[in-house]
Amino acid sequence: MKEIRVGLIGFGTIGAGVAKILNNNQEVIQKRLGASVSLVKIADLDIKTDRGIDIEEGVLTTSVEEVIDNPDIDIVVELIGGYEPARTFLLNAINNKKHVVTANKALLAKHGDELFELIEEKGLTLGFEASIGGAIPIIRSIRESFVANRIQILEGIVNGTANYILSKMSDENCDFDVAFKEAQEKGFAEADPTFDIEGIDSAHKIAVLTRIAYGTPITVSYTHLRAHETPEPRV
């Protein structure tokens, strides 16, 4: 059976979740792909914290180069977020002939053109479905299912924190501060929710979706941002 060898960059909450899914769902993955998926290396600055998952000895490393430069790795998954050093890591991985996966919409919004051009030049694949919509396959739908359709408008609530807060305020006629605090308590909002509250996260996602739907690369600087306001309650 073919083996797909994966390297992770980042082993925080999301990275540990990815590792756990790959380890716990091997049988399902093999049936669907006709191939096994193995974690070869995981790079993170903190490899001592217990993430609640059993990792084979020698897999964890503090050196990103052990992932990017490893000839035994087919796919590099970036899970650290932000612009740098994530951009540099992905560019180096692509230049080393690795397929790459990222959920980093901020990076894609700012440096997507550079990444997509290099990926095409090298004949590789850049997977980024998880960057927008979580488990909702919006990117694949636009790229594949609607490929022959003329998309006139993209509209919706694309930020999970905003979705929770606005729904709470509208349905229960409560104040923003109350809805926001509850969103944080339930884990919808980040410890630093600036990107969510100020609309920056939504702008990143709009930039990525616009590029896919219309073939027009835009940056966050081209979008109009407005912070949350109290909506009218539903009657």
Show where each model-derived region lies.
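N-terminal glycine-/serine-/threonine-rich beta1-alpha1-beta2 phosphate-ribose binding loop
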Residues: 1-95
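ADP-ribose/adenylate-binding Rossmann-like module
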Residues: 94-110
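Rossmann-fold NAD(P)-binding glycine/threonine-rich loop
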Residues: 105-126
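Rossmann-like NAD(P)H-binding beta-loop-alpha module
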Residues: 127-186, 200-201
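Mid-domain beta-loop-alpha active-site segment that forms a flexible
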Residues: 157-158, 184, 188-213
